[in-house]
Design a protein with these regions (language model features):
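Primarily recognizes the serine-hydrolase "nucleophile elbow" in alpha/beta-hydrolase
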Residues: 1-21
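A short beta-to-alpha transition loop/helix N-cap that caps and shapes the active-site region
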Residues: 16-23, 117-121
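Flexible glycine/proline-rich, aromatic-decorated loop/lid segments
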Residues: 5-7, 26, 74
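The feature captures the conserved acid-bearing segment of alpha/beta-hydrolase catalytic domains
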Residues: 19, 23-31, 96-105
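Helix-loop "lid/cap" segments that line or gate small-molecule binding pockets
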Residues: 30-42, 53
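Short acidic (Asp/Glu) and glycine-rich catalytic loops that position anionic groups and cofactors
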Residues: 9-16, 33-36, 159-163
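Conserved structured core elements
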Residues: 1-4, 27, 177
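Substrate-gating cap/lid region and adjacent catalytic-acid/histidine neighborhood
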Residues: 51, 55, 59, 63-196
């Protein structure tokens, strides 16, 4: 890694890049960026290159380009999370593969998390907070065949449970807790250093 030898210990909290899904390739991240740009353009009034920025008071494309990114995202009412990716420079391969081979920086590691790491709204992806909608969102991670047992284990039995602690626990485990555990476990197995 580029940072080899630059630090003596590491601390990680609230997730890692070793969750249920693989890290995006550069091509996939660029495609996602194009989709985001299209959503932004649609929200602020661009249609086939015309009416650019009209809905937000911009006179031309240059004025729109001059907006700070945060303001543009706010005006466009689009929420997005930056996507780390395998760019061939900083990240050359899947982190899980690096750790499986024991090629990570070998330093003591402290990992952790917080209560209520993630809201169920992240799993719902804009849909109403119902058991059925939460199940639909969770199926992408756990599959159709496991969903009823999963909801039984988490105690998600009614729509009320979706936004309360059972739903928070599920969302936190999907997005952060599992990936943090996996990072620590893989480092313990191949890093030759203690994990706390």
């Amino acid at each position: 890694p580029l940072c080899q030898g630059l630090f003596a210990q590491a601390m990680g909290s609230s997730g890692s890049v070793m969750g249920f899904k693989k890290v995006a390739t550069l091509k996939e991240a660029e495609e996602e960026g194009v989709q985001l740009a299209q959503k932004i353009a649609e929200k602020i009034g661009k249609k086939n290159g015309k009416k650019v920025g009209k809905k937000v008071g911009m006179k031309n494309l240059n004025e729109l380009r001059a907006l700070p990114a945060e303001e543009l995202m706010k005006l466009a009412e689009v929420r997005a999370v930056p996507v780390y990716n395998i760019d061939g420079y900083f990240m050359k391969e899947q982190p899980v593969e690096v750790f499986a081979k024991g090629e990570q920086t070998k330093v003591p590691l402290l990992i952790g998390g917080n209560n209520q790491e993630m809201t169920p709204l992240a799993v719902l992806m804009g849909k109403q907070p119902t058991v059925e909608n939460l199940k639909a969102g969770a199926k992408a991670t756990f599959g159709e065949e496991n969903i009823d047992e999963l909801f039984r284990l988490y105690g998600i039995n009614s729509d009320k449970d979706v936004l309360e602690q059972p739903g928070v626990n599920l969302a936190s485990d999907i997005f952060l807790d599992y990936s943090t555990w996996k990072w620590g476990n893989m480092h313990k197995l191949t890093g030759g250093q203690p994990v706390y």
